[in-house]
Each structure stands twice: as C-alpha cells, then as structure tokens.
UniProtKB/Swiss-Prot annotation:
Its EC number is 3.4.23.36. InterPro entries: Peptidase_A8. This is Lipoprotein signal peptidase. The chain crosses the membrane at residues 4-24, 62-82, 84-104, 125-145. It catalyses: Release of signal peptides from bacterial membrane prolipoproteins. Hydrolyzes -Xaa-Yaa-Zaa-|-(S,diacylglyceryl)Cys-, in which Xaa is hydrophobic (preferably Leu), and Yaa (Ala or Ser) and Zaa (Gly or Ala) have small, neutral side chains. Belongs to the peptidase A8 family. Pfam families: Peptidase_A8. PANTHER family: LIPOPROTEIN SIGNAL PEPTIDASE.
Length: 154
C-alpha cells in the first residue's frame, strides 16, 4: 500500500507547489508585494537564480547535479526502507517533493519562483517546495534520532 500512496502524495505535493507558483506569476507582478495576513505574511513574486537565500547565483548546472544526486539518493533510500517509520517516509517524501518542485522550475524557467515573505522576521523569501525541504530535513533528523534512541542503526 505504501508503494502506491507515497508516489501519489509526492505528485500531489509537487502539483501544489507548481500551482502556487503559477498563481503567483499570474496574479502578482515581478517584485510586487501584496499583504496576505497583515504583519505576518505577504506574497511577492521573485525570480531566484540561486539557491536558498539567493546564494550561488546563476549556477544552474550545479543545482541540477545536486538535485539529481539528492533526489536519487532519497528515492533509493525510500525504496529500501519502504516499511520504515512514518517519520522516515514523511521526511523522504517531503525532500523528494521539494527537490523536484524547484527542479521543475529550473528546467522550465531557468530560475525558481519564490513568493512567501514573513513580515514579522527578517528572513529570505521562499516557496512551497522550500517549505517541503525544510520540514523534510527536520522530520529526517527526528526519524534518525528516534532510530538511534531505539538502537536501530540502519
């Protein structure tokens, strides 16, 4: 059952990411900011030619290689541990979805569409795929910590 559900969830997460980016591009002009939840979240449309926090601008070949490697390793690990803990499955599904969501942008557009601006903190503008990656990495750390505390060293 997991072999069916996980790919479906992955496709749905990628679709949500891509639809959010398409909506932003259609409804908000480049570099425009629109208040969404006052003093908490604004929406904007930025083109990110780099990585997180706009580092390594215009290094698309590097991001392509890194994404192929990370997503490939995550898929292989997921297939080998399909009966693993829910923390592990959730984390890998989110990492794969986030990586592929931004990868699609880079292949299709040559940049990643970013749109979420947190008004209450000075933080980088990000997108839904970035959120998947961040939450996925946190869940992976929890999964590995739980495995370690249970004496499971796979």
């Amino acid at each position: 059952m997991r072999k069916i559900i996980i790919p479906i969830i992955t496709i749905l997460l990628i679709a949500l990411d891509q639809l959010s980016k398409l909506w932003i591009v259609k409804h908000i002009e480049l570099n425009q900011i629109k208040e969404f939840i006052p003093n908490i979240v604004s929406l904007t449309y930025l083109r990110n030619y780099g990585a997180a926090f706009s580092i390594l601008q215009n290094q698309q070949w590097l991001f392509t290689l890194i994404t192929i490697f990370v997503v490939g390793v995550a898929i292989i690990y997921l297939m080998k541990h399909i009966n693993g803990s829910y923390w592990l499955l959730i984390s890998l599904t989110l990492i794969i979805s986030g990586g592929l969501g931004n990868f699609i942008d880079r292949l299709r557009l040559g940049y990643v569409v970013d749109m979420v601006h947190l008004d209450f903190i000075n933080f980088a503008i990000f997108n839904v795929a970035d959120s998947y990656l961040t939450i996925g990495i946190i869940c992976l750390m929890i999964a590995l910590w739980k495995e370690e505390s249970n004496g499971n060293h796979n």
